[in-house]
C-alpha cells in the first residue's frame, strides 16, 4: 500500500471518519466486532462508508505499523495545505499566528507526536520541507492519535526562505538550540510566534539559526545533554501556550 493510503488503529480511524476524510472503505478483523470497533462500524454506516470483514492475515499484510488493532481504513492521499493558509486561518480566528516549523524530522513517531502536541496547544499549522523530512504516513497518522485531521500541514521548498517571508509579516521566529541565547521561559512568546525545531541528530543548520530572531534553550541539569525532537518541541509549545493563556487573562 502506497504512502498515505491507509489509516490504522481504532482511534485514528474514528477521527478520520468524524472529520470527513475521504475513506474508500474500512477493513475490520472478521469476527472481532467488539469494544470501540463497534463505534467504528456505527460511524462508518452513518457516513455510508463500505465496511469489509477480512481475516487477520490480510490486515497484517496491509499494516505499516504492526498496530492496526483490527481495523484499517483505505483512504485518499493526505492533502497538504498552502503555507499562506496557516496565517489566514489564524486571522479568521482573530488570533496571533502560532506556527511550528520542522527542519528535517526523519522519525515518523516523533513527527506524529509533534503533530499531536501541536494540535492540543493550539498551533495554527506546521511547516515541513518538501525534501529530507518525513511526510504524513500511516505511522505518523497513528502516532498523532488522529490529530493530523485537526491541524494544517504545509510543505515548502526552502525553510529559510519561508522564515524570511513570515518575518516580513511580523511573526517572531524562535529557534530551538542547546546553546540558545536565553531559556524558553525567559522568551516573550506573547506575539505572533513561529518555533523552529531541528532534526533529532543535527539540530538546526547554521543558516537557519542565523535566520531566527532568537535562539532559545531548554534547561537541562542531568548527564544527558539532549532531548528528542518531539519532547523538545512539546516543552516549547506548552511554554507558548502558557504565556498566551496568562496574557489573555490580563
Indicate residue ranges for each PLM-predicted region.
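N-terminal positively charged helical leader segments and presequences
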Residues: 1-89
Amino acid at each position: 500500500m502506497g504512502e498515505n493510503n491507509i489509516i490504522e488503529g481504532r482511534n485514528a480511524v474514528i477521527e478520520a471518519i468524524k472529520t470527513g476524510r475521504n475513506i474508500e472503505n474500512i477493513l475490520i478483523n472478521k469476527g472481532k466486532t467488539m469494544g470501540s470497533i463497534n463505534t467504528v462500524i456505527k460511524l462508518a454506516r452513518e457516513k455510508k462508508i463500505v465496511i469489509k470483514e477480512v481475516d487477520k492475515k490480510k490486515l497484517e499484510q496491509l499494516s505499516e505499523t504492526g498496530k492496526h488493532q483490527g481495523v484499517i481504513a483505505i483512504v485518499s492521499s493526505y492533502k497538504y495545505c498552502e503555507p499562506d493558509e496557516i496565517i489566514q486561518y489564524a486571522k479568521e480566528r482573530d488570533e496571533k499566528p502560532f506556527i511550528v516549523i520542522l527542519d528535517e524530522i526523519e522519525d515518523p513517531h516523533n513527527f506524529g507526536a509533534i503533530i499531536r502536541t501541536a494540535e492540543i496547544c493550539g498551533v495554527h499549522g506546521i511547516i515541513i520541507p518538501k525534501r529530507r523530512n518525513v511526510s504524513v504516513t500511516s505511522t505518523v497518522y497513528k502516532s498523532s492519535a488522529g490529530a493530523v485531521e485537526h491541524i494544517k500541514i504545509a510543505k515548502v521548498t526552502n525553510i529559510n526562505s519561508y522564515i524570511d517571508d513570515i518575518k516580513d509579516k511580523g511573526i517572531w521566529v524562535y529557534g530551538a538550540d542547546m546553546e540558545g541565547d536565553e531559556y524558553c521561559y525567559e522568551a516573550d512568546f506573547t506575539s505572533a510566534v513561529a518555533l523552529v525545531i531541528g532534526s533529532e541528530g543535527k539540530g538546526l543548520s547554521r543558516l537557519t539559526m542565523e535566520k531566527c530572531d532568537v535562539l532559545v534553550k531548554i534547561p537541562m541539569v542531568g548527564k544527558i545533554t539532549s532531548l528528542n525532537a518531539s519532547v523538545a518541541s512539546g516543552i516549547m509549545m506548552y511554554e507558548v501556550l502558557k504565556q498566551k493563556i496568562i496574557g489573555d487573562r490580563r
